[in-house]
């Protein structure tokens, strides 16, 4: 028995080296070749063949598959000991996912890893123990994504179309968003523009309202000033008469030298230097060299007339151009409701209400000649000039205008107060430039105006003293 036991021990001692001798030879024959590298698909099964091979029929005492390197934690992926798999000390991520496959005839040991993950990629050590001897070697696992060829055509189409579709949807959404933003921006700009226009309109409307209000106020003040100026001008009323020695030969004067009209033919009158021989005009008898003077001329329904003031030195012979530069400050009604101030150039205008009686005011020191519409108590026009030398009233009844302008010009002997017509009386004899008599119907004349003293005394006590020393204003 002892001999048999010793013989068995000796045989065992000889077989173990032989087993590992084959293992060593196998390893040396495959060291560094491509068999140590294994590739597995993601989600598939990896089969890691241990480079160490055993003699056929040999049952290893222990087989360990370890991850290398994994410091400070268990490295065991799979453990086979004493003929069965062991679960202790295994890495948690590999539990239930490994299978050890032994081929006794080939003497090979293979580790299968199920449901391969990306983190399974790396080095693995295969350790085999037979008896008291153990050997180990290393293999490397590479994890690859599934190839397109392994996918179904529908999956491939979906994989291609889906990203493109998502991209198109994103592009469409981006374009829609940009269009919406552009519309919102345009709408905002339009709203802003409308707001600005409304704001500007409101501002302009406010400015226009203020301007109109200011103009109305100014017009009211001007009307009040003109009315006040006309009323104060009337305080300087003078009774003007006509000078027959200056009358054109075709003019016919009344007996009281206050009415003049155009005759049909020239009258036999002396040709003196003071007489107009071309311009059908006549001057007043008064000479003004200082102070304020006001007179009124009734024009009635005449269609043409010229009234005003001229210098004593104006030319009486031949054609004369009436202008302030030549010593004329005249106002003319040319036709209908058209009026002209004979400035240089002429100033044309229309009046809201044609005057039936015209008031003329002269302030010599102030250099002012103003015309007033006595009918509605409004101002018509004002000349300004630095006067020198005597000034005289000027009258021109103008041509007959087809029979529409035959009425005379009548100088009011008193202030005109109403719209009564002043017409020549049929009785009596008339005379040319003093020879033909024209009398005025006294019943048609306006009533006699009260004296200036009576006007002042009728005013309130606080205004009387001030008006007694009042002079006409400068315009």
Curated annotation (Swiss-Prot):
Membrane-crossing residue ranges in chain numbering: 156-176
PROSITE patterns documented for this protein: B302_SPRY, IG_LIKE
Domain Ig-like V-type intervals: 30-140
CDD domains named in the record: SPRY_PRY_TRIM20
Alphabetic keyword roster: Blood group antigen, Cell membrane, Cytoplasm, Disulfide bond, Glycoprotein, Immunoglobulin domain, Membrane, Phosphoprotein, Signal, Transmembrane, Transmembrane helix
Gene3D superfamilies found in the cross-reference section: 2.60.120.920, Immunoglobulins
Tissue: Expressed in erythroid-enriched bone marrow (at protein level). Highly expressed in bone marrow and to a lower extent in leukocytes, thymus, lymph node and spleen.
Residue ranges annotated as Cytoplasmic topological domain: 177-475
Name the UniProt record assigns to this protein: Erythroid membrane-associated protein
Processing after translation: Glycosylated.
In-chain residues carrying the UniProt-annotated modification Phosphoserine: 418
Positions annotated as glycosylated: 132
Function: Possible role as a cell-adhesion or receptor molecule of erythroid cells.
Source superkingdom: Eukaryota
Cited InterPro entries: B30.2/SPRY, B30.2/SPRY_sf, Butyrophylin_SPRY, ConA-like_dom_sf, Ig-like_dom, Ig-like_dom_sf, Ig-like_fold, Ig_sub
Membrane topology: Single-pass type I membrane protein
Family under the similarity heading: Belongs to the immunoglobulin superfamily. BTN/MOG family.
Result after altering residue 57 to R: In Sc2 antigen
Presence of keyword Transmembrane helix: yes
Result when mutating residue 47 to K: In Sc5 antigen
Subcellular location: Cell membrane; Cytoplasm
GO cellular component, one term: plasma membrane
Intrachain S-S bonds: 50-126
Entry-linked Pfam families: PRY, SPRY, V-set
Gene Ontology biological-process entries: regulation of cytokine production; T cell receptor signaling pathway
